[in-house]
Each structure stands twice: as structure tokens, then as C-alpha cells.
From Swiss-Prot:
This is Phenylalanine--tRNA ligase beta subunit. One of its GO terms (molecular function) is ATP binding. It comes from Streptococcus pyogenes serotype M18 (strain MGAS8232). It is found in: Cytoplasm. One of its GO terms (biological process) is phenylalanyl-tRNA aminoacylation.
Length: 801
């Protein structure tokens, strides 16, 4: 919200600087983003009166003699198409500073001396989007009353201070000058002064010219007035200045009046050309599937049943609350104007403007809410302005469909309730004074009082809201600092928090870097790497399809991060994330999904760089598995790795499921080359674990085992096996022999070659045995080896080499 300091001072009698006002507002609940002075950086810009204007042959230039208040006219060469004799213009004299700190100097153009520059508003730093179209390609023409030689700032209100407010959704009342005036008046203990318009109505009734009806419960009220015999023309300079300072382009006096009322009351309005109506009945209803509308910006909008439209003769003429239609827009030939003031459902307007990517000053106010109590007042004010600025004749009365509650909302509380929550010792007189400043009614006493909250403050409905208002106006800086009286208790991590912290520490100790990716993704990516996909949980109204579904895996988000970094020449990556996935086993439209904590990581590129001693080493499956092995070892958990080809987006020969107590808790492996290509990433290895399953399996107590004094004994065994036999199957077979003294199984060689028959491979293991209480003998170890050999032969068909 852009607030004109000049305009604000007309509504509230304050004598503070804009900077002091901004600081005060920021400390009482409405944040000020900044203050801008349009004239800042500009100098030596004066009013000029063009005395003569001659075309320069064979050029687009004009040789002008301009009166700038000096003794003699100033010769200026100007290329603007709309320069002519008799007009008042903006002149930058030599030494002047215009936009971008550009300094104007005397010069020659086509051999002709030019003693200054006739300026457009763009050259003063104003945006093209707010400059009247009649001046967008040429110079600005000043009012007739401008005096040659005067500084131009007061004529264009460039010396105003524009205060930019950051309005939160709960304070939509401040999206109007009247709302801001009420706020400032409350802060400084002043009274507001709102100008009144004298509306003179003709004998003809509005109901004779127009009829309105509502055919949707999303239209709360719809009111109209009719103004005849209007003269459409440019608005007076003061109104154009006011709109431009608020970031709105002046169009003509009729449209500008509706925008003025929007800024003043916060009530969106629209003006229709009555003579372009095919019928005299306006109906506000939901759009029908297949209907379309060409809006004021010239775009054809395809409508859905979720949109609200204003119709005449059952044809849409406006997109309710968002933008009018081109077919009934006001133009230079318009003579009879229909003014609309309505209240539409904010959620419906938000959906429509979001779907069409068509946000306007009107839609933003309907989305946040408008003041029910001033809808008709704003309508009458607009009609009176058209009577004043467009010489229109206002038909008597208005037509309206749908009624709104306009009486104040009553909220009750007590003085004790207020003081307990603020830690203050306010008296009832203090409370009365504060609510008087706010313009709220107050009845009762300190035991129980009732506040009559005006409809303009629809954010206040419960006692806690009253406490907040009291604190704001009393001053947050005046609230006493109180310390809690209860004794403190030592904080303790929950098991989930403790596991999360431990896993994070282990991951970072292994060289992984934490990331945080979006929980929302595309429906396809949401289930891309899920071991057991469930029903999708999708947003009903997503901002974009890329963020429309809750993820059921974390790997897809990690790969997006990998792709982002690889595209920026960062190819050696080791990333991890701890976050939630969302599983939905029932109806996603009726039930909330289960939120499950998961741990995932992704590695790609080199694990070791090339140097003078070693060759570069790329990451592989065993690096990924090694990270998991370290994690499980530190958590004192024993898992199994089972090869799988069931995960479509993982490499079928380099992927394994991770089993804990015979339950799948995750997977590890290489991303399928096709998937990696789709993500534009190199060979990448990933893993994902169910943290909830890890937490459930953690041993409650860990018993310390004394370090044995007795030495271990090691035996190597080389096995000839079928090529399909996995390492995990061999480990399982060795462990199933039931040798209690076996403490370690390590694979140290795998061989396939000419000396091995086709379809076979050789795998060599180092087995370590140890008795914590005694020395092992060779005979004991030999028996252990016999049992292990027998188990290997029976279970995996191994031959000892």
C-alpha cells in the first residue's frame, strides 16, 4: 500500500515528519517498507510556456521558443511528437539533474543551439506503467495555471512523500486511506476528518434504468447507481497526481474516480457503459463451463464454474472482483455510466485471479476483505465525484441485491483479563482512552466491559484481539518486563530428536552436507523412488504443478539439488537430508497423510582427487554402502542387503533393499542411467532410510563388553561359486553355521577370468575367530571351518578351492 503523506495530512491533523510517522507506525503494528520522494535527485526543473514551435525540415525535431520565467525566451530543440505552441511543459535548464542523475547541458542538435530540455515523465524517473497513455510517447503537458519559471514539483506532487506499507492479511483495513487515517489518528490521539460530497440527485430513479440480481452465494451484495450525461475527459491534474503516486495509471475522469474511491475507501468499484448493455438487468452469478470473456487488457479468458461473472442479457460483461470486460468499457463516447459496488467471496476471487494469473488492486482487496459498512457510502461518493468532475446527472437512489451486516461487532472482556496478559496495571480510564483513540465504543466497567468494534476492523472478534489493540496503542515499549516465577526444568531430547541429532552428526562426520528440499513436488516425482507408493496427497489449488503433491520419497528432491549444482559446475557432491515423507493409505480428500521421518543421501563425482601419488577415484556402490554400514554400526543395528530389480528408477544390477528384522526399511544403489539422463546428472548413488523404523529397532540398553586379553585367529577361505551368488548370500550362509567365536567376515578378493570355468567366480574371505575368555586352539578353529564349509556347500553350492 502506497500512502501519500500529503493526502494523509488532509485526513488527520498531524505535525510529524514522514520519517517519524514511519517509525511510529512500525512500532505499533503496521510495518513501513520505506519512504520515497519522487522529486529526490531532481533539480532545476521549471515550468515552461511554449511560445512558438517550428518543424525542422526532414527531421522529427521541433525548434521551440520557451518562456521559463527569464528575461528572454529559451531556445530548445525537442523531438516529442506532441509538443506545440501554447502548452505548458517541464523544462530542464542547463545544470538540471533528471533521472539516473543525468545532468543537462547546453548543446547543439543538427547545428541548432538547445538551451535545455523539454521533459517527459519517464525522464523524471516515473514508470511507464503509471504514465497516462496520452503522454506515454511524448512530453508531459502541465495545467494551464502553471506559472513559467516555477519549480514543477508542486504541480505534479513530486514533492510528496510516498510511504510504502507492508500490510499483513489481518490488517486489510489499512488497504485504504481512510483505514490508514484511522490508524494514525489512534496512534497520535487525533481525530479523523473525512470530506463529504454533496450529492444532488435527479427526479428519475435508478430503478427505472437498471435492475440487479444475485444468483450465487459467493456474491454477498451487489449495488449500482446510474449517472447520465457524463462528459468523459482527462481527470484534473490533482487526481492524476494522486493516482500516479499510488502506482495507478490515470485513464479518464470516470475510471479515475473508481480508482480514487478504491484508494480512499478500500472499496473496489467498476464503471460500465450503460449504452453498451443489451439488457437493463445485471445478474451476478457463477460462470458456466465453456463461457469466455475478453477483459480490459484485451485478453480472452476461458472461464470455469469456479469463477464469478457479472452478466447482462446472460452474457458475461465483467470478471467479478478481478477485471472488467472490454465490451462495456468506458470510452470517449460514453454518456451514461453504471457504477458497481459489491462484496464478493474472497476465496473465490483468489482462486480466479490465481488461475488466470490476473491480479489487480481490486482482487487483492476482495481477497483480504472489505468494509461492509461503507459499501453504499463509497458508491454515493463515487456518484458525487462524477457529478463534480464529469458534469453527470445522478439518478435518485440505488439498486441493491443482498444485504450485509453493518452494525459494530461486540466483544466483551475484563480489566483483570487485560492486565494479567500484559503484565500491566492499567485502569479502566486508560482502557477508555485507548478505545476512544481507536474510535471504538465502550460500555460497562472494569469488572466487565463490552467494546463495539466498527466493521472496518474485521480482524477483531475475541478478547485476545482487544488485548492486542490495547498493547499496540499503549505502546509495546511501555509494557513491563516480567520473568517467569516457576522454577526451570532441564530440557531433554525425545528419542526421535536424539536419533535425528546422532544421524546428522554421523552423516556430517562422513563428509555429507545437509540440504533442505521442498516437501511439495510434481505428482510423478512424488512417487518416483518410493519403495511402496501410496495414495497421492495433492493440493487443490497449487501455485504451480511443480509444487502440487506431497512427496513420498526424498531422493527425487535430492536429485533436483544435484542437478542444480551440476549445472553450475559443482560435480563432486555428497549431500544428505533428514525430513518427512507423506504416506496416505486412505482417502486423501478426507484424511491427513502419515508423516514419516526419513534419511536420504546422494553422492556423485569423485571421492578422491587425482594427485602425484594416486589416481582419481569415482564414487561407486560400495562408497554408498560404506556410509550406511558406518551408520548402522554406530547405531548398533544389524541389517541385510538384498539385491532388487523392482525399483524402476534404480539401476537393476546395482541396487539393494535394506532389511532390518526382515522388514524393508530403505534402499541403496545407483540411479538408473535413464533417470539420471532425465535429471541431467552424472552417475549418482543414493540411499533412503525410514528413521521411524530405525528408532523402533534401537536397543534400549547397550552393554559394554570387556576388551579380551586373548588373541584372535584368522583363516582365509577361497570359494568357487555360481556367478549369480551374492555376497550377502555367502555371509548369511557363514553366519548360519552358528559359530559363536566368529567375530568378523571380510571379502578380500573377487576373481572371474580365464582360469575359472564359464558361469563361475572365485570369492575369497578372511574369517576372524576369538574367544574372550581363553586362547583358541588350531583344532577348535579347524572344527569351526568345517562347519562353515559344510554350510556354504549346502546353502550356496560353494566349492572350497
Amino acid at each position: 500500500m502506497l500512502v501519500s503523506y500529503k493526502w494523509l495530512k488532509e485526513l488527520v491533523d498531524i505535525d510529524v515528519t514522514p520519517a517519524a510517522l514511519a517509525e511510529k507506525m512500525s512500532t505499533t503494528g503496521i510495518e513501513v517498507e520505506g519512504i520515497e520522494v519522487p522529486a529526490e535527485g531532481l533539480s532545476k526543473l521549471v515550468v515552461g510556456h511554449v511560445l512558438s514551435c517550428e518543424d525542422v525540415p526532414e527531421t522529427h525535431l521541433h525548434l521551440c521558443q520557451v518562456d521559463t520565467g527569464d528575461e528572454t525566451p529559451r531556445q530548445i530543440v525537442c523531438g516529442a511528437p506532441n509538443v506545440k505552441a501554447g502548452i505548458k511543459v517541464i523544462v530542464a535548464v542547463p545544470g538540471a539533474r533528471i533521472a539516473d542523475n543525468y545532468k543537462i547541458k547546453k548543446g547543439k542538435i543538427r547545428g541548432m543551439e538547445s538551451l535545455g530540455m523539454i521533459c517527459s515523465l519517464q525522464e523524471l524517473g516515473l514508470s511507464d506503467s503509471i504514465i497516462p497513455k496520452e503522454f506515454s510517447d511524448g512530453i508531459q503537458i502541465l495545467p494551464e495555471e502553471a506559472v513559467p519559471g516555477d519549480a514543477i514539483f508542486k504541480y505534479l506532487d513530486l514533492d510528496d512523500h510516498i510511504i510504502e506499507l507492508s500490510i499483513t492479511p489481518n490488517r486489510a483495513d489499512a488497504l485504504s486511506m481512510r483505514g490508514v487515517a484511522h490508524e494514525v489518528a489512534a496512534i497520535y490521539g487525533k481525530s479523523v476528518s473525512f470530506p463529504q460530497k454533496n450529492l444532488q440527485e435527479s427526479d428519475k430513479a435508478t430503478s427505472e434504468a437498471i435492475e440487479v440480481a444475485i444468483a450465487s452465494d459467493k456474491v454477498l451484495t451487489y449495488a449500482s447507481r446510474v449517472v447520465e450525461n457524463v462528459k468523459v475527459k482527462p481527470s484534473p491534474q490533482w487526481l492524476q497526481n494522486l493516482l500516479m503516486n499510488a502506482g495507478i495509471r490515470p485513464i479518464n475522469n470516470v475510471v479515475d474516480v473508481t480508482n480514487y474511491v478504491l484508494l480512499y475507501f478500500g472499496q473496489p468499484m467498476h464503471a460500465f457503459d450503460y449504452d453498451k448493455f443489451e439488457d437493463h438487468k445485471i445478474v451476478a452469478r457463477a460462470a458456466r463451463q465453456g463461457e469466455s470473456l475478453v477483459t480490459l487488457d484485451g485478453e480472452k479468458r476461458d472461464l470455469t464454474t469456479e469463477d464469478l461473472v457479472i452478466t447482462v442479457a446472460d452474457k458475461p460483461v465483467a470478471l467479478a472482483g478481478v477485471m472488467g470486460g472490454q465490451a462495456t468499457e468506458i470510452d470517449g463516447n460514453s454518456q451514461t455510466v453504471v457504477l458497481e459496488a459489491a462484496v464478493f467471496d474472497g476465496k473465490s476471487i483468489r482462486k480466479t485471479s490465481g488461475r488466470l494469473n490476473l491480479r489487480s488492486e481490486s482482487s487483492s482487496r476482495f481477497e483480504k476483505g472489505v468494509n461492509y459498512a461503507t459499501v453504499l457510502e463509497a458508491l454515493d461518493f463515487a456518484a458525487a465525484m462524477l457529478q463534480e468532475l464529469a458534469e453527470g446527472q445522478v439518478l435518485s437512489g440505488h439498486v441493491q441485491a443482498g444485504q450485509l451486516p453493518t452494525e459494530p461487532v461486540e466483544v466483551s472482556t475484563s480489566l483483570d483479563y487485560v492486565n494479567v496478559r500484559l503484565g500491566t496495571e492499567l485502569t479502566f480510564a486508560d482502557i477508555q482512552r485507548i478505545f476512544d483513540q481507536l474510535g471504538f465504543g465502550l460500555t460497562g466497567d472494569e469488572t466487565r466491559f463490552t467494546v463495539a468494534v466498527p466493521r472496518r476492523r474485521w480482524d477483531i472478534s475475541i478478547p485476545a484481539d482487544l488485548v492486542e489493540e490495547i498493547a499496540r496503542i499503549y505502546g509495546y515499549d511501555k509494557l513491563p518486563t516480567t520473568l517467569p516465577e516457576a522454577g526451570g526444568t532441564a530440557a531433554e531430547l525425545t528419542p526421535t530428536q536424539a536419533l535425528r541429532r546422532k544421524v546428522r552428526g554421523l552423516a556430517e562426520g562422513l563428509g555429507l552436507t545437509e540440504i533442505i528440499s521442498y516437501a511439495l513436488t510434481t505428482p510423478e516425482k512424488a512417487i518416483e523412488f518410493a519403495v511402496a507408493p501410496s495414495h497421492l496427497t495433492e493440493l487443490m489449488w497449487p501455485m504451480s504443478v511443480e509444487r502440487s503433491a506431497l512427496r513420498q520419497n526424498m531422493v527425487s528432491g535430492m536429485l533436483d539439488t544435484v542437478a542444480y549444482n551440476v549445472a553450475r559446475k559443482q560435480s563432486n557432491l555428497a549431500l544428505y537430508e533428514i525430513g518427512k515423507i507423506f504416506e496416505q493409505e486412505v482417502n486423501p480428500k478426507e484424511d491427513l497423510p502419515n508423516e514419516v521421518n526419513h534419511f536420504a543421501f546422494a553422492i556423485c563425482g569423485l571421492v578422491a582427487q587425482k594427485d602425484f601419488q594416486t589416481q582419481a577415484q569415482a564414487v561407486d556402490f560400495y562408497h554408498a554402502k560404506g556410509i550406511l554400514d558406518t551408520l548402522f554400526a554406530n547405531l548398533n543395528l544389524k541389517v541385510q542387503y538384498v539385491p532388487t530389480k523392482d525399483l524402476a528408477n534404480m539401476h537393476p544390477g546395482r541396487t539393494a533393499l535394506i532389511l532390518l528384522d526382515e522388514q524393508v526399511i530403505g534402499f541403496v544403489g545407483q540411479v538408473h542411467p535413464g533417470t539420471a539422463k532425465a535429471y541431467s546428472i552424472p552417475e549418482t548413488y543414493v540411499a533412503e532410510l525410514d528413521m521411524a523404523a530405525l528408532e523402533a529397532a534401537l536397543p534400549s540398553d547397550q552393554t559394554f563388553a570387556e576388551i579380551t586379553k586373548f588373541p584372535a585367529m584368522t583363516r582365509d577361505i577361497a570359494l568357487l561359486l555360481d556367478r549369480e551368488v551374492s555376497h550377502q548370500a555367502i555371509v548369511t550362509a557363514i553366519e548360519s553355521a552358528g559359530v559363536k567365536r566368529l567375530t568378523s567376515i571380510k571379502l578380500f578378493d573377487v576373481y572371474e577370468g580365464a582360469t575359472i570355468q564359464a558361469g563361475k567366480k572365485s570369492m575369497a574371505y578372511s574369517l576372524t575367530f576369538q574367544n574372550p575368555n581363553d586362547n583358541l586352539t588350531d583344532e577348535e578353529v579347524a572344527k569351526y571351518m568345517e562347519k562353515i564349509t559344510k554350510s556354504l556347500t549346502e546353502q550356496v553350492g560353494a566349492e572350497v578351492r
